[in-house]
Amino acid sequence: YRLQLHAGFTLDDARSTVPYLAGLGVSHLYLAPVLTAVAGSAHGYDVLDHTTINPELGGRPALERLAETCHRHDLGIVVDIVPNHMALVSQQWRNAPLWEVLRDGRESAHAHWFDVDWNHLGGRFGLPILGGSLADELAAGSLQLDVGRPDEGGAAGQPVLRYYDHVLPLSPEGPSQG
């Protein structure tokens, strides 16, 4: 039986349904993604951290409580772990693996997480977010070189490129040639 988890229906809410579902003869709960996603995500496929259970859903303690309750009622759990989904948020520093790949390129410890053709674009990572041509965006002053602010988590103190709401890392070595 599939349960769609979100801030309004958490792991503890799912836990409260277990006796009823077991009474219906359900053998397994199929849980929508439980990994840490963008705040307020209604579906969980916009993952920010593949190593933690979403605190909006109750975190790891709530998942453990659900597992214990399911075990007592002979229900199995199937979790949609979505390793192939990751959020592209405007504040890329909220997604540490993506931030590192954008900043460090193929030298990032997370470069192998992404399907990147490093031979395309002269070995650089392309991110299609511009609303117009590069020349038009430069002429409009839409691209701003800056330093990450203290309230910007992983961007704090680092060189960044701002494009409207987007905050993008720059290589510490400076711009590449070519």
Set out the residue ranges of the language-model regions.
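Acidic/aromatic-lined carbohydrate-recognition and catalytic surfaces
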Residues: 1-178
